[in-house]
Amino acid sequence: MDLETKVKKMGLGHEQGFGAPCLKCKEKCEGFELHFWRKICRNCKCGQEEHDVLLSNEEDRKVGKLFEDTKYTTLIAKLKSDGIPMYKRNVMILTNPVAAKKNVSINTVTYEWAPPVQNQALARQYMQMLPKEKQPVAGSEGAQYRKKQLAKQLPAHDQDPSKCHELSPKEVKEMQQFVKKYKNEALGVGDVKLPCEMDARGPNPMYIPGGDRSTAAAVGAMENKTAERKKTQYSCYCCKMSMKEGDPAIYAERAGYDKLWHPACFVCSTCYELLVDMIYFWKDEKLYCGRHYCDSEKPRCAGCDELIFSNEYTQAENQNWHLKHFCCFDCDYILAGEIYVMVNDKPVCKPCYVKNHAVVCQGCHNAIDPEVQRVTYNNFSWHASTECFLCSCCSKCLIGQKFMPVEGMVFCSVECKKMMS
C-alpha cells in the first residue's frame, strides 16, 4: 500500500501543468510534459516556469516550507487539512479614482505581492521605485517575472528531498542538515523602512532617552538625536548612491542595520535579479538568491538541476553531473566513455547530433560528422574534401585556395562567377 501511495504521489507531480502551452515556444511546443528526472518539458526543453502553468498554491507551499522552523513563521499559516505550511504573502489592492466625462470610475490595481508593512503609502512608494516591468501587478509582465524568479531563485529541490530524483538515505540526511544550516545561518527576509527610522542597532523605538531626568531634558535629548539623524548621509550598499531620507529603503538583518539598499538594488550578487519577495541569503558580505547561495556551497548537476550530495560525480565542460545524469540531452543515452558534442552547453551523443544538429554540406548535401574537418563561411559549411569544397562552375578543388563566395556557392575566379550569373 505504501509503494502504491508513493507511485501515485510521483505521478501527480508529473501531471501538474500537463499540456500547458509554452509562453516561449508558442505553437512549436505540444504542451508541457515534465521529463522524468530533468526539470524541463520533454517536448520543447523549456522549464515549467516558461509554461502557462498556474502554480500559486504550489509556490506558496514551497515558500511556506522554506520559512518553516525559522524566525519567519509569522509569514506562514498551516492548513488545517494536512498541516502543510503555506506562505502568507501580502497582496496589496490599490484603488485610484479615474475622472471620466460623466462620472468618476474606480481603477483597481492588484499587486500579487507587496512588502508586509502596515504603512500602505510606504508599500506603494516601494513599488514605484521598482522598474515597471518588474512590478508584480496581477496579469502583467511584472507578475510573470515574479513567477519565473520564484521558480528560478527558490527551487523546491534545493530544500525538499522528496522533490529530488532517487536520493540515497545518506544523501537525504546530508541534504536535511544542509537545509537546516542555511536556514539558521543565511536565510533572511528584507525589511522596508525609512532610513531615518533605523540606526546601526536596528529599528529605533519611540522612546524618551534619559528616563531618570526631567521631562524637559529628555525631550531635548530626543530632539538632538532627531537632528543628528537628519544630518546623516545615507547611501545604498549596492550602487553607493545617496538615498533620500523620505524614500523607502531595504534592510537585511543578517547584513547588519548599518547597510541599506534601494528597492531596485536589492538583488542577487550573482544573477543581479531582484530578490523575489525580498527573500535573501547572506554570505561573505554579499546578498544571494537561494539558487546561487546553494551553488556557492554545493556542486549542482547540470542534468537534473539538483545539488549534488554524493562524493562521486562527473566534471565535464566546466560543469558538474551526477554519474547517472551525464547523458545525451536529446535521448538520455549515458555518455560515459562515449563521443559527444556540446550543443548550447548541453552534451549530445553522436547519432543525435548528426540527426538533429549537424550542419549540412553545401557540396554533397549530407550532414557533416562532428569528427570530420569542415570549411565554414558565414552560415554555409562544406566537407573539407576534394569531393565537396569545389568551384560551383568548373569543379576545381578550393582547399587552400582563394575563393569567391556567393550565397551558398563558391567560385575560383571572376570568370567562373560570371558564367554562373
Swiss-Prot record:
Transmembrane segments: none
Stretches assigned to the LIM zinc-binding domain: 234-297, 299-359, 362-421
Subcellular location: Cytoplasm; Cell junction, Focal adhesion
GO molecular function, one term: zinc ion binding
Subunit structure: Interacts via LIM domain 1 with ZYX. Interacts (via LIM domain 3) with ENAH and VASP. Interacts with ALKBH4, talin, actin, alpha-actinin, GRIP1 and PXN. Interacts (via LIM domain 2) with ACTL7A (via N-terminus). Heterodimer with ACTL7A; the heterodimer interacts with ENAH to form a heterotrimer.
GO biological process, alphabetically ordered: negative regulation of cell population proliferation
PROSITE patterns on file: LIM_DOMAIN_1, LIM_DOMAIN_2, PET
Chain intervals for the UniProt region annotation (Disordered): 133-164
Function: Scaffold protein that may play a role in cell adhesion, cell spreading and in the reorganization of the actin cytoskeleton. Plays a role in the regulation of cell proliferation. May act as a tumor suppressor.
Keywords on record: Cell junction, Cytoplasm, LIM domain, Metal-binding, Repeat, Zinc
Keyword match Zinc: yes
One Pfam family hit: LIM
Signal peptide: none
Principal location: cytoplasm
Family classification: Belongs to the prickle / espinas / testin family.
InterPro entries reported for this sequence: LIM1_Testin, LIM2_Testin, LIM3_Testin, PET_domain, PET_testin, Pk/Esn/Tes, Znf_LIM
Biased composition (Basic and acidic residues): 155-164
Stretches assigned to the PET domain: 92-199
Domain commentary: The N-terminal and the C-terminal halves of the protein can associate with each other, thereby hindering interactions with ZYX.
Protein name: Testin
Record-level GO cellular component terms: cytoplasm; focal adhesion
CDD domains to which the protein is assigned, alphabetical: LIM1_Testin, LIM2_Testin, LIM3_Testin, PET_testin
Species assigned in the record: Microcebus murinus (Gray mouse lemur)
Keyword Zinc: yes
